[in-house]
Amino acid sequence: MSGPRPVVLSGPSGAGKSTLLKKLLQEHGSIFGFSVSHTTRDPRPGEENGKDYYFVTREVMQRDIAAGDFIEHAEFSGNLYGTSKAAVRAVQAMNRICVLDVDLQGVRNIKKTDLRPIYIFVQPPSLDVLEQRLRQRNTETEESLAKRLAAARADMESSKEPGLFDLIIVNDSLDKAYWALKEALSEEIKKAQGTGQS
């Protein structure tokens, strides 16, 4: 594969993946394209269908998963999340590097495909900092917060598995984390720019 490789971003909720991704798309919008995931959860305030997620019913999503339309899917807190093949193809059709934001289960599923992306794990400096960030969102109940923190602890342990990720970024400072992300993707950015994009 001579063109730029897709990028898989993973990490616990509240680690800063979305913020890093927004910065990357603001600076390099003509090079990167975000693969919009599907979910059965309700939209949060300010989220747009087709931009942040495709918000669908469980019935629709289960039907499409059964039909083999998804690269990866997972269930978390009673909601389904997943990346459709069509969403990735839509980004690639624009000659952009496809960025996928998936959980650890999704990473393991993608490892079984022929996608060959760069795998990057974004983690908070500590679980205490993560808890603080999640509480500031005001979107979690105590029960869902406890679930997210337990999942984060497990993800941060699993991320150490040899060969699972190409890079682990500790997001203790947004600027430093963003610099590390850009540095890791510099080769792919050059490849994409070499195909006549700016």
From Swiss-Prot:
Expressed in retina. GO terms for cellular component: cytosol; photoreceptor inner segment. It catalyses: GMP + ATP = GDP + ADP. Signal peptide: none annotated. It is an enzyme of class 2 (transferase). Pfam families: Guanylate_kin (PF00625). It is found in: Photoreceptor inner segment; Cytoplasm, Cytosol. The keyword Transferase applies. Its main location: other. Residues 4-186 form the Guanylate kinase-like domain. InterPro entries: GK/Ca_channel_bsu, Guanylate_kin-like_dom, Guanylate_kinase, Guanylate_kinase_CS, P-loop_NTPase. The modification N-acetylserine is found at S2. One of its GO terms (biological process) is purine nucleotide metabolic process. The active site is at R44, R137, R148. Gene3D superfamilies: Guanylate Kinase phosphate binding domain, P-loop containing nucleotide triphosphate hydrolases. One of its GO terms (molecular function) is ATP binding. Belongs to the guanylate kinase family. PANTHER family: GUANYLATE KINASE (PTHR23117:SF13), GUANYLATE KINASE-RELATED (PTHR23117). This is Guanylate kinase. The gene is GUK1.
